[in-house]
């Protein structure tokens, strides 16, 4: 059994496909690309694969990770080509790496994620982008905490979101403000 980590991009209309559908999509892609993937045992065998921190619907990505186990493998280049040949526009495999037997799972390796956030077109602030960016940046650095109340089925919990933000910046791209966030996962 060989462990493989796959890095892929999700963009365009595929950003509207949910995690479970992406998982089924990759299961079909593995079969079509003739990847010799391992199956679980039991009455309902399924392909052994796990996604690291799957994104929500509507979010594009340049780096999502998927771990699989295979019985045998070809070269990384051949596997990437075989998978990409089966993919529709909007999903692209960018890396296919063999892992050591004692490698941690992709889920446990992801500690943070980088996000670029844009205003929806037509909803940009009326102020000059630089003035707006300076104001937001100043507000973020001066504020000691950002408290929210997280509600679960059984309780409510107050959380400080600022502790989860490792990096924050506001810049201008194509005349529009862009928020950059590196946040804990």
Predicted features by range, described:
Residues 3, 12, 17-65, 76:
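Glycine/small-residue-rich interface belts in oligomeric ring/scaffold proteins
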Residues 37, 48-185:
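Structured-RNA-binding interfaces characteristic of tRNA pseudouridine synthases
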């Amino acid at each position: 059994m060989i462990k493989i980590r796959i890095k892929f991009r999700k963009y365009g209309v595929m950003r509207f496909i949910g995690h479970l559908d992406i998982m089924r999509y990759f299961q079909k892609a593995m079969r079509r690309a003739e990847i010799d993937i391992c199956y679980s045992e039991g009455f309902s065998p399924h392909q052994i694969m796990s996604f690291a921190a799957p994104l929500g619907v509507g979010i594009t990505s340049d780096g999502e990770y998927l771990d699989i186990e295979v019985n045998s493998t070809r070269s990384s280049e051949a596997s990437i080509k075989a998978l990409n040949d089966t993919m529709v526009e909007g999903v692209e495999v960018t890396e296919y790496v063999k892992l050591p037997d004692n490698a941690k799972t992709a889920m446990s390796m992801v500690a943070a994620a980088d996000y670029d956030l844009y205003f929806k077109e037509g909803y940009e602030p009326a102020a000059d982008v630089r003035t707006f960016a300076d104001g937001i940046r100043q507000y973020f650095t001066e504020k000691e905490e950002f408290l929210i109340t997280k509600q679960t089925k059984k309780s409510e919990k107050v959380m400080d979101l600022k502790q989860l933000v490792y990096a924050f910046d506001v810049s201008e791209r194509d005349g529009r403000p862009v928020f950059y966030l590196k946040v804990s996962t």
